[in-house]
């Protein structure tokens, strides 16, 4: 009986894992790719073509003794002014993450002078786009073929697999 319970549990878990999961995951961007957060890199070009969505992360790698990550307003961003940051994202390790948890424009710069060498990044964070609409399923009567098939196959498989397992295990 214990094997039967374990088998039922395994089958149910297999079905749950095989079920389609929403394709919504946060993405981690390493700022500057393999050049990281350093002077003389054009971060505007790095950000081009990327879509930043709510929940994504910006991962900064830098020398913590020479640089930092400050969030500022647009005016301070344009003038490389770090006197009144909105937020200091630096945690001291030189491996810091900015979580994009609001739909807004983020203006980030190095407040230790690196901004004048190009160490500034502006990203616009958007809401996730809606999932693509699936193709319409032809209905037969009031129940679609796919729904009817799923309603039939899941209960049948829940009982068929354990029965097959029992037969196979008795043969050995």
From Swiss-Prot:
Residues 142-172 form a propeptide. Pfam families: Cu_bind_like. Residues 27-127 form the Phytocyanin domain. It comes from the Eukaryota. One of its GO terms (molecular function) is electron transfer activity. Glycans are attached at residues 42, 73, 88, 101. Its main location: membrane. Residues 1-26 form the signal peptide. Keywords: Cell membrane, Disulfide bond, Glycoprotein, GPI-anchor, Lipoprotein, Membrane, Signal. Coiled coil: none annotated. A lipid is attached at residue 141 (GPI-anchor amidated glycine). It is a lipid-anchor; GPI-anchor. Belongs to the early nodulin-like (ENODL) family. This is Early nodulin-like protein 17. It comes from Arabidopsis thaliana.
